[in-house]
Amino acid sequence: MPRHKTRILLVDGDSTVQHLRALMLRMQGYDVDTAADLESARTVIAAAPHYNLVIVDVGLFAGPGLEFCEEIKQRHPHQKVLMQVDGHLYLGRESCPDKVVSKQDGPQHFVYEVQRMLEAT
């Protein structure tokens, strides 16, 4: 469990997946804000720009998800970004997300990868 509240923004258009993933992260002691689409995520980040981690579901947003990631990195270069994908996605070394996680790997792997990313901070 984190010693202090670690802030995470979870962006996912599937309300069921969003709710379950946010619940899992809250059970680990994280402070989780959610957004159902990229426009809402932009609004949340503008109002409260410091998140320890931003998680974006690329499966629902395709190209715009990667553009959103690049936008975050331009405004906040040290912001950690994890992308969730429905299958497997290969991105070059210079691409935006710090980590890509497949939804096929399951919820325990998702929490594990989030913890690993946050510990590396």
PLM features: what roles do these ranges have?
Residues 46-49, 71-79:
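Conserved phosphotransfer cores of two-component systems
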Residues 34-53:
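Acidic, metal-coordinating helix/loop segments flanking the phosphotransfer/catalytic sites
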Residues 71, 93-102, 106:
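As written
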Residues 83-85:
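Hydrophobic/aromatic residues positioned on beta-strands within the core alpha/beta folds
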Residues 15-33:
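Two-component/phosphorelay signaling modules centered on CheY-like receiver
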Residues 1-15, 22, 42, 70, ...:
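Non-catalytic signal-transmission and effector/linker regions of two-component phosphorelay proteins
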Residues 56-72:
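Conserved phosphotransfer microenvironments
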Residues 7, 31, 50-52, 80:
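Structural signature of beta-strand start/N-cap positions in the alpha/beta core
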